[in-house]
């Protein structure tokens, strides 16, 4: 019998990789043994109790593993079989995306993600109490304007609330090449840690924060392994397909703030049909599928400020 290996070579995103951990955990209990992993992000699995051997895709080829392992490919976006049954990520819960590719689903109580950080390393001048923000750029539909992040920070500071910013510049290759630079700006009361933290330091900062503010992002899913207050800013993908599960539910210490537009166009199959004449098609998700001049699904600064005050008072 070949040893089981969770094959994530097609899974490129940080958040998508974190969302494989519920499937990994279920495989552990099914096989009754630790599961090896092939991944672009080995640091995600470094301290995971369910993992046997971690293979880095930059160092190990799939072909070299085929003889000794059963390769369980869990993340195969839109790859169809003879019955044209592919998976469409914008229409699916991102945790189920991994599980469904292997032929099963996860129950709500099984959907929590796993990440075990290294020990906390103190950060110089870190405030005792702070709101943590994640001001980075992604697809336009998932980017809150940089000026809004600055204004939110200023409003919090003016009310005596320290702010710490985290995030890393990156890029993503999918249907488009998307550059994801950070919004890097000084903070009067607090600390700018953009492009400075490890994944473990980031986890601890989220855990220690009064609240963590982010769009739909990789760090949203990392936050799902903490006990922090999470504020997710609205975007065009239905929040129920992305919001973290903790204690078997999605509303535990979780707050979704949307704007006036609540149709979640990126998760509506009608737009795929409109673009491709088939529900199998994925419309261009980077923009507004209603062709509005601005993203009305995004919240205002005052909405976010008021929610933070409500949480931390």
Task: Specify the residue positions occupied by each region the protein language model found.
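Catalytic machinery of carbohydrate-active enzymes
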Residues: 1-313
């Amino acid at each position: 019998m070949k040893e089981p290996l969770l094959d994530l070579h097609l899974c490129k995103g940080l958040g998508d990789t974190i969302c494989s951990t519920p499937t990994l955990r279920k495989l552990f209990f099914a096989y009754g043994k630790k599961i090896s992993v092939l991944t672009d992000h080995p640091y995600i699995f470094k301290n995971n109790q369910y993992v046997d051997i971690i293979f880095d895709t930059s160092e190990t080829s799939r072909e070299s593993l085929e003889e000794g392992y059963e390769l369980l490919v869990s993340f195969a976006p839109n790859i169809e079989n003879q019955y044209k049954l592919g998976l469409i990520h914008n229409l699916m819960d991102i945790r189920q995306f991994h599980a469904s590719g292997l032929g099963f689903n996860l129950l709500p109580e099984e959907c929590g993600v796993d990440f075990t950080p290294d020990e906390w390393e103190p950060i110089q001048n870190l405030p005792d109490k702070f709101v943590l923000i994640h001001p980075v750029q992604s697809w336009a539909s998932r980017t809150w304007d940089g000026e809004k992040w600055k204004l939110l920070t200023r409003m919090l500071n003016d009310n005596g609330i320290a702010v710490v910013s985290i995030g890393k510049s990156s890029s993503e290759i999918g249907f488009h090449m998307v550059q994801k630079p950070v919004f890097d700006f000084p903070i009067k009361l607090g600390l700018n840690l953009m492009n400075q933290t490890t994944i473990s330091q980031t986890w601890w900062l989220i855990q220690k924060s009064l609240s963590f503010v982010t769009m739909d992002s990789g760090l949203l899913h990392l936050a799902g392994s903490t006990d922090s207050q999470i504020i997710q800013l609205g975007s065009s993908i239905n929040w129920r397909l992305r919001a973290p599960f903790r204690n078997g539910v999605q509303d535990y210490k979780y707050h979704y703030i949307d704007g006036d537009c609540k149709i979640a166009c990126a998760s509506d199959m009608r737009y795929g049909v409109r673009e491709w004449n088939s529900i199998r098609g994925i419309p261009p998700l980077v923009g507004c599928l209603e062709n509005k001049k601005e993203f009305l699904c995004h919240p205002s600064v005052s909405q976010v400020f008021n929610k933070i005050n409500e949480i931390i008072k």
